[in-house]
Amino acid sequence: MLSRILFFLIIISNTFSCQETKEKIPKPLNPNGDSELALLMRELQTNTSIIKNEIEKVNFDPSENSNNEYFAKLIESRHKLIEAEPSDKNLKSTNTYSNFVKMYNYSVSNFLNNNIKTNNYNNMINNCISCHQQFCLGTISTINKLKIK
């Protein structure tokens, strides 16, 4: 009787140990593919979040941080907004998008050239929200989290 139980346990353990485990592949954020502009926006969001954390530090010194790699990436990314290929080809069919990009670029310049103040940072974020109220509404809640209170 004991040998039957032992034999049965060995068979069960071998059955479960020999099964292949399927590797879970993460689903893409956009099942239709990610456009150049979408990827750039995600990069901007990541870098801006890091900049927000830098500004919120107690001993934040703008003169030290303005040369930070994330500030440099912000400058680099903002210049790519006009050329980046959007998911929706109609996005650039009018001047509306390019005007929003100009406003955003102005706010980034103002932020970086005026001692990196909180109100200039929040103005930059508000320009993001203004554009996203016209295009891609779903990200506004994420952008709002970038504001400094």
Where are the predicted features?
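The canonical Cys-X-X-Cys-His
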Residues: 124-136
